[in-house]
Amino acid sequence: MRIAAIINARAGTVLRMSPSAVTERLSVVWGSLGHDAAIILAEGKDMGRMVRKACRDPDIRAIIIGGGDGSLSRALEHVLASGKSLGVLPLGTMNYMARQIGMPLDLAQAAVALAGAVQTPMDVGRVNDRYFLIRACFGAFPEFIQSRDRVRRKGGSFLEGALAGLSGVARRYRIVEAELSSPGGRARIATSFLMISNNLCRDSDPFLLERERMDGGSLGVYVGRSAGPVGLMELGLQAAMGRWASNEALFQGEMHWLEVQTEQRKPLISIDGEVEKMEGPFRFDILPGALSILVPK
């Protein structure tokens, strides 16, 4: 099978191993298993250009994205339009999607797993015209990610990044004031945390976020019960312990669509770990079985 592997040259694993070591390891593994693989290193806007080019190639059957969850999310628009399968090569920090589908985190083991993976339909979340695989968040979490990633880009450790993230939240504490509209009616909220996930979350290991399933055809909606810093601290501690379904600091709901009208015209939003300012209002919905993803046997 001919595949295209587009690798984020700025991904953590690539920087640790060196780009040449990563491409050589993948070439050896896939070549030994009889796969014809085009391995492309790219960064920034070139990632999107290379994904788009590979998706237009009729000879390529699968698009492998090497990077973090943000790299996967950014590739969705082109992969969905092409009808090709998406493969996950976990080279990022948290690699939530890889963990969700049982992909090994070791580079060589992941390459072997991808070679024998099974095409599996999976739901995709959407906010306005942007797709996501894991979650979108408003409030304190985007601030946490921004501050954390500044430190990580400078070579800081996971712990140093986490501490910087907490410090950033303390300095720029944000309250989300919004009107929510859903099939169940309308509600006004004032909270420090609003998360919309691709399917409902379950309790998991510490620092992870796992969904109950990836083909349930619904969004999970999580709203912090308190707008104050004490409530946010309680929520964050429970989330850090992997408590999502049993997190008492959250209101939780399940729905097929949700509209969010924030008081702020262009609030910060994190989508699969990438932070940006996006203009509202925000329309969230779920696309059942829209993506063919390669899942290890």
UniProtKB/Swiss-Prot annotation:
Name of protein: Putative lipid kinase MamU
Domain DAGKc positions: 43-131
Note from the entry: This bacteria makes up to 60 cubo-octahedral magnetosomes of about 45 nm in diameter which contain membrane-bound crystals of magnetite (Fe(3)O(4)). Expression of just the minimal mamAB gene cluster (MGMSRv2__2365 to MGMSRv2__2381), including this gene, is sufficient to form a minimal magnetosome chain with small magnetite particles.
Pfam families on file: DAGK_cat
UniProt EC number: 2.7.-.-
Active site feature: E274
Enzyme class at the top of the EC tree: transferase
Induction: The last gene in the probable 17 gene mamAB operon.
Function: Might phosphorylate lipids.
Keywords: ATP-binding, Cytoplasm, Kinase, Lipid biosynthesis, Lipid metabolism, Nucleotide-binding, Phospholipid biosynthesis, Phospholipid metabolism, Transferase
Binding site for ATP: G68, D69, G70, S71, L72, S73, R74
Observed phenotype of the null mutant: Normal magnetic response, normal magnetosomes. Deletion of approximately 80 kb of DNA, including this operon, leads to cells that are non-magnetic, lack internal membrane systems, grow poorly, have reduced mobility and take-up and accumulate iron poorly.
Recorded family membership: Belongs to the diacylglycerol/lipid kinase family.
Gene Ontology, cellular component aspect: cytoplasm
InterPro entries: ATP-NAD_kinase_N, Diacylglycerol_kinase_cat_dom, NAD/diacylglycerol_kinase_sf
The organism of origin for this protein: Magnetospirillum gryphiswaldense (strain DSM 6361 / JCM 21280 / NBRC 15271 / MSR-1)
Keyword Transferase: yes
Subcellular localization: Cytoplasm
PROSITE patterns: DAGK (PS50146)
Transmembrane segments: none
Biological process according to GO: phospholipid biosynthetic process
GO molecular function: ATP binding; kinase activity
